[in-house]
Amino acid sequence: MADDHPQDKAERERIFKRFDANGDGKISAAELGEALKTLGSITPDEVKHMMAEIDTDGDGFISFQEFTDFGRANRGLLKDVAKIF
């Protein structure tokens, strides 16, 4: 799939970096859980479910590519998250 508007990519990068608390280039379940607490109450099961959905290669982390693919498939959700972060 062709890349989006450069502004969309920059927005995804900005959000990804906010979720990637330790700056290692990937989002762990713990980082995802901490970031999502900002959005409200979230259970460990909800974090596990989201990881399973977004972590398509099953390595236990969300790469920027996986985050991008999820963002493209869920543009409305990502825009809502962008307003908060």
Curated annotation (Swiss-Prot):
Record GO terms (molecular function): calcium ion binding
Record domain EF-hand: where: 7-42, 42-77
UniProt binding sites for Ca(2+) 1: 20, 22, 24, 26, 31
Keyword Hydrolase (UniProt): no
Pfam family membership, one: EF-hand_7
Binding site for Ca(2+) 2: 55, 57, 59, 66
Keywords of this entry: Allergen, Calcium, Metal-binding, Repeat
PROSITE patterns noted in UniProt: EF_HAND_1, EF_HAND_2
Cross-referenced SMART domains: EFh
Assembly and oligomerization: Monomer.
Name used for this protein in its record: Polcalcin Bet v 4
Organism of origin: Betula pendula
Lineage of producing organism: Eukaryota, Viridiplantae, Streptophyta, Embryophyta, Tracheophyta
Gene: BETV4
